[in-house]
Amino acid sequence: MDNKNITSNLQFRKAEEADLERIWVIIGQAKAQMQRLGSHQWDEHYPALETIRQDIETGSGYVFCKGNTVVTYGAISFDGEPVYKDIDGKWTNELPYMIVHRLAVADEMKRQGMAKRFMLEAEEVSRQKGIYNFRVDTNYDNEYMLHLIDSLGFQYTGEVRYRGNNIRKAFEKCIYPHVSSFGVPGYTIREAIYEDAGIIFDAIDKNRDDLRTWLPFVDGLKSVGDEQAFLSSSLQVPYEERDIVYMIEKGKSICGLIGFHFSDRANHRTEIGYWLLPEYRGKGLVTRAVHHLCLLALCEKGFNRIQIRCAIGNTASNAIPQRLGFKQEGTERDGELLINGEYTDINVYSLLKKDIAE
């Protein structure tokens, strides 16, 4: 049987009040299947009709429709699960996470990959919110869900305890952000996440003598934990308010970082900073990456002003805003203390939204 043809006319969307009756039929089918298979995860009390109704009202209920018929249901939540705080085990980090609960597939669509497809759509919903932790739990006797979790690359993290002393296995996985091209063949850019801390730290640590000349923060970065703390401080901020840190990559190799800093959303202004490893310089990477972020900031994020600050002696860094049409507004005298103990003047450049329309 060709599953591709069967699922080609599917629509994934938020559940609506009009879907409730059909969803409840699917929940009943799922309960009956669990009973046949000897799983005790769901019973006559859970999930209740009122729970499904609340999912829909809060916007956490999602469905797959085949034509006009709902064939899969699940709840995608970002509100946290209280029992996860007392896990007998350990989560990778304490950043915001996404959970899928109450996943059920209509009998006529079973064995067609619908549950897996729902989970992958949930990952996309999470990416759009800038949340990259995915947590789930399931009963020890729910072999179907355990197989699904394993096929999606989740890692076991411990046990959680629900009502009635119901102990479940807990799992988590990292959802990696999508990568984007930015005008240089073979290179990509994406948001840096907690799991990148190790490779970022290693890259900085191996190039300390070079990077510390113009990047005073390097001397304060002493461990992977320091980098994890830095990334966490960004990732815990809601996506629409976040100063995103991006990795420039060639394949799976890090080339450098670029990102927004000190954004003032009330006045629609932000700042861009960047650094590149020595072996990737001179290829136009930073110029193209800064151009990419400028378009993102001015055309999509609602900023009106972008600022770049460069030490006067850092010729390569100054060349970036100059090349991209930034205006030099002036120089901050003794604007930064370098690692040699000397102050350096800082050139200040700006680009306004109206500048790119001229």
Where do the language-model regions lie?
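Hydrophobic adenine-recognition pocket in adenosine-nucleotide-binding enzymes
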Residues: 15, 103-105, 138, 276
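Active-site rim helix/loop that mediates acceptor-substrate recognition in acyltransferases
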Residues: 41-65, 221-241
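Short, P/G- and charge-enriched loop/turn segments at secondary-structure junctions
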Residues: 49-50, 85-92, 158-159, 233-235, ...
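Conserved beta-strand in the GNAT
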Residues: 63, 69-78, 99, 104, ...
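Conserved acyl-donor/pantetheine-binding loop and adjacent beta-alpha core of acyl/acetyltransferases
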Residues: 75-104, 110, 268
